[in-house]
Amino acid sequence: MFHPRARTMLLLSLPALIIGVASSLVLIASMKVASVFQQFLWQRLPASIGIAYDSPFWIVGMLTLTGIVVGLIIRYSPGHAGPDPAIEPLISMPVSPSALPGLLLALIIGLAGGVSLGPEHPIMTINIALAAAFGSRLFPRITALDWTILASAGTIGALFGTPVAAALIFSQTLSGSNDIPMWDRLFAPLMAAAAGSLTTSLFFHPHFSLPIAHYTQMRLVDIASGAIVAAIAIAAGMVAVWCLPRLHELLHRLKNPVLILGIGGFILGILGVIGGPLTLFKGLDEMQQMAFSQTLGAGDYFTLAVVKLAALVIAAASGFRGGRIFPAVFIGAALGLMLHAHVEAVPAAITVSCAILGLVLVVTRDGWLSLFMAAVVVPDTNLLPLLCIVMLPAWLLLAGKPLLAANRHEP
């Protein structure tokens, strides 16, 4: 009835569905626990002892304590809470399952404690390791690389609430051939991503879009404006690229994770006092609050962008377990709103979307993911042609430039 190619794809369908659903459930459970813990640490606990949650004492104390606790987990847990996200790429080969409890605990405490990183890197690591460990027993004919691809696709679908991001990302890595077309290779990852996104949507829907005025029609001057905005965002991101490996090396000369993360948490607390509560946490909810605020001006947006960028570098350099994509989106949104406030003739839809495109491109060096994030934050079909054009000079600027990553150090 079915062609052998179709039967091969169908055989991978069941593992892909299972992995997609499981990847989403791991994400949902982790985010729910972190959210409950965050409410306790930042609302109930300070209220019960009569301290404002946004007081300098509470912000500095909470982030310093968060750093110390995460440092203790990394030092004493089996596997040292997994790989350092500042060194490893977002998608990598499976780690030992023994490292996963410590990694999950470090992630939850970091998210709840206000660290300026997202969940994407640790969740990706956890899901890939679980898929490889359990999948190889249930379906031994499927290789570790295939489990890695399915788990990462399912996680991407769950994180962003849509399989589109996974389709875009894997379309450039799973290239077809004369024997196996690209869509044959994409079939199982796309099914895993669809299962992950649908499972996530049953519980909550990631809300990325901002209330920004509709962009009506593309003009030549808008292309130039968008390219300039993207270049400014890339320049800001390259400052972080220069700082991260140097700061990472400096901090890790201390050798002791408790001391490193305690110092990192203290610095994050100082930055949190300067930037306020909006610069804490992973950045998605805070981005919505920033966009809906009627009181922030150009100077406030600039402060938020600079502080959040500094917090991202400090958190990554210290070794906190978290990802850099969600904070980069916040930074891009703040930078875009600041540029629009300075030059109101340039539509906010252009400044925000192009700034996000530039920042995410620096962080991920993935053109499809950068376009996707810019398009979902400012969901306007009239912007898509402009963003595709602006991507070209942005990609040229970053060609051959170093990545936002630290170097490995000898123990």
Curated annotation (Swiss-Prot):
Q: Which GO terms describe its cellular component?
A: plasma membrane
- Main site of residence? membrane
Any coiled-coil ranges, and where?
none
InterPro entries given in the database record: Chloride_channel_YfeO, Cl-channel_core, ClC, ClC-type_chloride_channel
Subcellular localization, as worded in the UniProt entry? Cell membrane
Q: Which domain of life is it from?
A: Bacteria
User: Topologically, how does it sit relative to the membrane?
Assistant: Multi-pass membrane protein
Q: Where are the transmembrane segments?
A: 9-31, 57-74, 95-117, 148-170, 186-208, 223-245, 258-280, 295-317, 322-341, 345-363, 376-398
Q: Which UniProt keywords apply?
A: Cell membrane, Ion channel, Ion transport, Membrane, Transmembrane, Transmembrane helix, Transport
Q: Which Pfam families match?
A: Voltage_CLC
The answer to whether keyword Lyase applies is no
Q: Which GO terms describe its molecular function?
A: chloride transmembrane transporter activity; monoatomic ion channel activity
Family recorded in the similarity comment:
Belongs to the chloride channel (TC 2.A.49) family.
Q: Supply the name of the protein.
A: Putative ion-transport protein YfeO
This chain's source organism reads Salmonella typhi
Q: What is the lineage of its organism?
A: Bacteria, Pseudomonadati, Pseudomonadota, Gammaproteobacteria, Enterobacterales
